[in-house]
């Protein structure tokens, strides 16, 4: 009896620890990226994304090949180009759009907009795959959309370009989720193996555009910045932490239930919003805060509805279900793929 009690306490402690370290890495990566764009004046989102991809490629190789902390999931060479490469392309676009939006709009606004991802995923699955969704799923999306509309209307630091980048980032995230269900069918990828295969492709895809479009700007920045080497160390550290974030996602998925994962994910957004406001002091109106709150409550309610419907007895109409390991595919920068690098 006492052993059972100790085991439950250890399980709860491990779950809490996994959530806290996930929050810590996620919030730190977001704040560091915003700091790089705003405080260090390094306004080159393609290069920032490329650094993150390189660090993640190296980190995944070390974890799987050197330290052997995770077994390698073997992928047929043909499937790497036929399945992994298209996923890597969408993944690359998703991360770049997230960093572009972070350059132009506050963290609080960007994180709130990304909460639209469940809605865009449902709509795309309905339009493209003609999947059936219970009316309760559609109803649960109303507060999410309403909250984001209220937040957008009342945002004091609104920027059209940043808003569009975040919005298209949601569409890219949703597309990635839908593609994962078909292209990665048969492969049980965890977040580390996903990074191992996709990050090198993403580096290859983004390397040339980053070099051609941002090379001159980076050289000018390097000459004008008072301490460029210190800034580059911060940039490199943000890439290392971005990989650590993926490792923390694997840990939290293994240590929590689906409901806990959903609630913790939405609370994580609230933590990121609060911490970013404490650091950058971007103006937030009362109605803007209300809109953000409505959105987060709506996301939590949406997760609850999906979980409730997934537990229905066989034979009862069910909604399409996304496995938890596809809910947050390698957010090398932002966490939610329903986020994420």
Swiss-Prot record:
One GO-annotated biological process of the protein: nucleotide-sugar transmembrane transport
Membrane topology (UniProt): Multi-pass membrane protein
Subcellular location: Golgi apparatus membrane
Protein's UniProt keywords contain Glycoprotein: no
Domain EamA span(s) in chain numbering: 33-152
Keywords: Golgi apparatus, Membrane, Sugar transport, Transmembrane, Transmembrane helix, Transport
Transmembrane segments: 17-37, 44-64, 89-109, 141-161, 192-212, 233-253, 260-280, 284-304
UniProt-listed Pfam families: TPT
Tissues where this protein is expressed: Expressed in rosette leaves, flowers and siliques.
Main subcellular location of this protein, as a coarse class: Golgi
A GO CC term assigned to this protein in UniProt: Golgi membrane
InterPro entries: Sugar_P_trans_dom, TPT_transporter
Functional summary from the UniProt entry: GDP-mannose transporter that may be involved in the import of GDP-mannose from the cytoplasm into the Golgi lumen.
Family: Belongs to the TPT transporter family. TPT (TC 2.A.7.9) subfamily.
Name of the protein this chain belongs to: GDP-mannose transporter GONST5
Organism: Arabidopsis thaliana (Mouse-ear cress)
């Amino acid at each position: 009896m006492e052993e059972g009690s100790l085991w439950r306490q250890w399980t709860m402690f491990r779950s809490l620890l996994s959530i806290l370290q996930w929050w810590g890495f996620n919030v730190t990566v977001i704040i560091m990226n915003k700091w790089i764009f705003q405080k260090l004046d390094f306004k080159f989102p393609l290069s920032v994304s490329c650094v993150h991809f390189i660090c993640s490629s190296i980190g995944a190789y070390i974890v799987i090949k050197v330290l052997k902390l995770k077994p390698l999931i073997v992928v047929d060479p043909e499937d790497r180009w036929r399945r992994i490469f298209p996923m890597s392309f969408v993944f690359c676009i998703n991360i770049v759009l997230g960093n572009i939006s972070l350059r132009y709009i506050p963290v609080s606004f960007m994180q709130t907009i990304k909460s639209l991802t469940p809605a865009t995923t449902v709509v795309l699955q309905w339009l493209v795959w003609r999947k059936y969704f219970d009316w309760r799923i559609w109803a649960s999306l109303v507060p999410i959309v309403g909250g984001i509309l209220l937040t957008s209307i009342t945002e004091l630091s609104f920027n059209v370009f940043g808003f569009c980048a975040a919005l298209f980032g949601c569409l890219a995230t949703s597309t990635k989720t839908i593609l994962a269900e078909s292209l990665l069918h048969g492969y049980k990828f965890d977040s580390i193996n996903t990074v191992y295969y996709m990050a090198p492709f993403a580096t290859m895809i983004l390397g040339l555009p980053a070099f051609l479009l941002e090379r001159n700007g980076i050289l000018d920045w390097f000459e004008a910045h008072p301490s460029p080497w210190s800034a580059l160390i911060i940039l490199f550290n943000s890439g290392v932490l971005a990989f650590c974030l993926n490792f923390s996602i694997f840990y939290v998925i293994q240590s929590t239930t689906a409901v806990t994962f959903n609630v913790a994910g939405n609370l994580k957004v609230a933590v990121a919003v609060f911490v970013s406001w404490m650091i950058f002091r971007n103006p937030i109106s009362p109605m803007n805060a209300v809109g953000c709150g409505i959105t987060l409550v709506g996301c939590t309610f949406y997760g609850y509805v999906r979980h409730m419907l997934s537990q229905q007895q066989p034979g009862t109409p069910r909604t399409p279900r996304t496995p938890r390991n596809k809910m947050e595919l390698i957010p090398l920068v932002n966490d939610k793929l329903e986020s994420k690098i």
